[in-house]
Amino acid sequence: MLGLRFSVRSLLAILVVWLGIILLASPAQAAGDPYVSQYLRVTEPVAIDLDGNQTRLFAPDDFVVGKRLFENNCKNCHLGGTTLPNPSVSLSLAALQGAVPQRDNINNLVDYLRQPMTYDGTEENYVCRQVPGSWLPQKQVEKLAAFILRAAQKAPGWGTSDF
């Protein structure tokens, strides 16, 4: 009986130590995501242009969520910010700024994601899939847009063939 009690106490002690390590050693998500902290240079909230006149602060965790959404839904066609189906139109900042309307702010990029249009804005783009609100709520699609814009601003090689 003494051996069994010692085993249970030992297991409980190990469990408590393990949980303590997990809880105390788990920093904010962004600090745990080297891409967000190192390449996007996000370690504290960052102002991203909403519509040309206003900005909104996005927290490091927002960029982690945006990155995850990009990886799960966009990366197959937009690896490293390129556009594999149409290599001449990437997700580089210059390309986003050159689109009609410009896609270099949250609102316009979200509008594009909701209803993709060709680069010149004249007709629907059927190559890029729509992101309806029933699939991705507004806050989530804004985090995705913030990730794309921050990557276009800061990530080395984003939107080029040099990634």
Each model region followed by its residue ranges:
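An amphipathic alpha-helix signature
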Residues: Q102-R114, Q138-L149
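Gly/Gly-Pro-rich "capping" loops immediately C-terminal to redox-active cysteine motifs
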Residues: L79-V110
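C-terminal capping alpha-helices of c-type cytochrome domains
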Residues: R129-F163
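The canonical Cys-X-X-Cys-His
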Residues: F70-G81, L144
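Sec/Tat signal peptide C-region and signal peptidase I cleavage site
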Residues: L24-A30
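N-terminal secretory signal peptides that target proteins for export/translocation
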Residues: M1-V8
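Electrostatic cytochrome c docking/interface patches
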Residues: G32-L69
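Bacterial N-terminal signal peptides
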Residues: L12-L23
